[in-house]
From Swiss-Prot:
Active site feature: E210, K343
Binding site for Mg(2+) 2: D245, E293, D318
Tissue: Expressed in flagella of epididymal sperm. The alpha/alpha homodimer is expressed in embryo and in most adult tissues. The alpha/beta heterodimer and the beta/beta homodimer are found in striated muscle, and the alpha/gamma heterodimer and the gamma/gamma homodimer in neurons.
Protein's name according to its UniProt entry: Alpha-enolase
Pfam families recorded: Enolase_C, Enolase_N
Metabolic or biological pathway, per its Swiss-Prot or TrEMBL entry: Carbohydrate degradation; glycolysis; pyruvate from D-glyceraldehyde 3-phosphate: step 4/5
Post-translational modification N6-acetyllysine, affected residues: 5, 60, 64, 71, 89, 126, 193, 199, 202, 228, 233, 256, 281, 285, 335, 343, 406, 420
Protein species of origin: Rattus norvegicus
Example GO molecular function: RNA polymerase II transcription regulatory region sequence-specific DNA binding
């Protein structure tokens, strides 16, 4: 079934910034997709095209990306009469039309919007759920429900507090189903709110961009202490583990790291990569920390390699790998990390996202599917994580509707699968291992 019409528009993301939405029509109906946007972005990400017209939306408009879709991409795809199930062919055509390494002509936000809409249309064309269509595209015979990694304490570039490390997450690995994992996550979240309120007052329970709390604490260890206490209060000490996203590129300063980077600059407090690694190891020893994302700067390859070799936990590459097959191949060759963070808008098409995932998995890595801090009500990544069988997803706290939209969609998928539903649980790092 070919594409009859494509129409793009500017809509608003969860931070009140414009983003791209695409409507794609086939004889089967309308298929709509919206593109997310990150705050702490890796320098190697595909280009998100913004207007940079300071008189409009502080320069963050996306009318150029929208125009590229409406005036260039849409007519080309409609005239070619390509079948929407041919995801790779359509993505390839857009990439060739763009002609740049990082999608800077059309913008990754333009290409991705169309790519996501095509994928949704392809599923309906085949008469299967979206997660099944994605599983087919990836060559996966089965599907798996992921462990959710709830970002319940926000710091770094996502929050106005002093905390340097960006995300402190809870993973209910001891749950027996996704629905139970949601309940555990929600109960720990509410206990955490009470713990923070008692210790720091009601003001401290305001939430950050991803629905997590952002109490004004400086010590990263204090965030772990709060989590440990909330998990215990909720009665889930044996069932919940902790993950972190440090986003260390945000506080990398000339070969060292500044754990108080939101205060006036003072080089005397910078610490070395080895000192930072020792700090992480103390966290791993004292708390149930099983996963650390972006522990070092995106170009501090030596520090990554040393840490991954000795930490004994999941080390996730985000800014390091930016969902880019070339960066993933380099990181795999150097054993820099052992898990890929998969963000569709870092690479800018469904096909390349699937390739990045398969490449990571073929190197024995785990894969965690991720939202961005600027999100929409689009739920594509919920189906993506199930179809790709990655076993883990992070899409915020159990708070804020743009986050819950994804979690609720996974609940529906679990219900639809019925007795065939398989939850990753404690095997979240390698859920396909028999």
């Amino acid at each position: 079934m070919s594409i009859l019409k494509i129409h793009a528009r500017e809509i608003f993301d969860s931070r009140g910034n414009p983003t791209v939405e695409v409507d794609l029509y086939t004889a089967k109906g309308l298929f709509r997709a919206a593109v997310p946007s990150g705050a702490s972005t890796g320098i190697y990400e595909a280009l998100e095209l913004r207007d940079n017209d300071k008189t409009r939306f502080m320069g963050k408009g996306v009318s150029k990306a929208v125009e590229h879709i409406n005036k260039t991409i849409a007519p080309a795809l409609v005239s070619k009469k390509l079948n929407v199930v041919e995801q790779e062919k359509i993505d390839q055509l857009m990439i060739e039309m763009d002609g740049t390494e990082n999608k800077s002509k059309f913008g990754a936000n333009a290409i991705l919007g169309v790519s996501l809409a095509v994928c949704k249309a392809g599923a309906v064309e085949k008469g299967v759920p979206l997660y099944r269509h994605i599983a087919d595209l990836a060559g996966n015979p089965e599907v798996i429900l992921p462990v959710p990694a709830f970002n319940v304490i926000n710091g770094g570039s996502h929050a106005g507090n002093k905390l340097a490390m960006q995300e402190f997450m809870i993973l209910p690995v001891g749950a027996s189903s996704f629905r139970e994992a949601m309940r555990i996550g929600a109960e720990v979240y509410h206990n955490l709110k009470n713990v923070i309120k008692e210790k720091y007052g009601k003001d401290a329970t305001n939430v950050g961009d991803e629905g997590g709390f952002a109490p004004n604490i400086l010590e990263n260890k204090e965030a772990l202490e709060l989590l440990k206490s909330a998990i215990a209060k909720a009665g889930y000490t044996d069932q919940v583990v902790i993950g972190m996203d440090v986003a260390a590129s945000e506080f990398y300063r000339a070969g060292k790291y500044d754990l108080d980077f939101k205060s006036p600059d003072d080089a005397s407090r910078y610490i070395t990569p080895d000192q930072l690694a020792d700090l992480y190891k103390s966290f791993i020893k004292d708390y149930p920390v099983v996963s650390i994302e972006d522990p070092f700067d995106q170009d501090d390859w030596d520090a990554w390699q040393k840490f991954t070799a000795t930490a004994g936990i999941q080390v996730v590459g985000d800014d390091l790998t930016v969902t880019n097959p070339k960066r993933i191949a380099k990181a795999a060759g150097e054993k820099s990390c052992n898990c890929l963070l998969l963000k569709v808008n870092q690479i800018g098409s469904v096909t390349e996202s699937l390739q990045a995932c398969k490449l990571a998995q073929s190197n024995g890595w785990g894969v965690m599917v991720s939202h961005r801090s600027g999100e929409t009500e689009d739920t594509f990544i919920a189906d993506l994580v199930v179809g790709l069988c990655t076993g883990q997803i992070k899409t915020g706290a159990p708070c804020r509707s743009e986050r819950l939209a994804k979690y609720n969609q996974i609940l529906r998928i679990e219900e639809e699968l019925g007795s065939k539903a398989k939850f990753a649980g404690r095997s979240f790092r390698n859920p396909l291992a028999k």
